[in-house]
Amino acid sequence: MAAHGGASAALDPEQWLREAEAAYDRVASYTAVFHKQQRVAGELLRKETILLKCRRTPFSLYMKWIERPYKGSELLYVAGWNEDRARAHRGGILRFVTFNLDPRHPGLMADNLRPVTSTGIGYLLESVATNIRKAIKAGELAFAELGAETVYGRKTRILQAVFPKDKARDYDGHRFVINQDLESRIPLRIRIYDRDGKLVENYGYENLVLNAPLADADFDPKNSAYRF
C-alpha cells in the first residue's frame, strides 16, 4: 500500500548508501521469508517463496522453498565447507536425492540470473551500491525519494535510481525501485526494470529478523528439522 507524497525529492545517493551500509554493518545474521522473481532468457519466471537463514561469518545460507513451484526443496551453503559446494535437494518425490554442486553449476543456474552465493541482503546492497556509484562517477544518475509505502507490514521509504536508457546495458537495469525500512534502514525490497519497463528482478524480505540467534546447527545438514 503506497502513500506517495507527491513530487519526488532529490536525495544525496552517496549519503544514502553510506547510511544503508552502516546499518547492514551492524547485522551479523538474519532470518526472513525471501521473495524472489527473475526474468531469465526473456521469460518472467514464477515467484519463489523461501525460508531464509543467513549468517555473515562464515558466509552461510539455509534455504527452504515453502511454496510451489519448488516447495520442499532445501539448500545449504557454508563458505569453505563441503569443498565450497552447495548441498541441495528438490521437494516431492526427489527429496531423497541430494546433490553437492558448485554454486555456478548449470543445475543451480538454470532458473537463476546469479549464483546462490549472491543470495541475501548483503549482496543486494553491494549490487545497488556498485551500480549507483558507477553512475555517480559517470555523472548520469537520477536518484530521488518518491514517498512512503508499507511493505510486509513495515513502514518504508521509496528510493528510485534511474540510469540512462541508452546505457542501460552498462548497468543491471534501467530503473531500480528500493524500499528501505524506516526503522532499521535496511533495504527491504528492490525491483529492477529494464529500458522497456519490464520487471527483471524482484527481491523482498518479509518477517525480517536482524541479528537472529543462529548457531552452527542451523547450517548443518544433520539438523533433524532438515531433510538432507
Locations of regions flagged by a protein language model:
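N-terminal leader/targeting segments and the immediate start of mature chains
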Residues: 2-47, 53-59, 67-69, 140-144, ...
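An acidic-aromatic
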Residues: 43, 50-123, 198-201
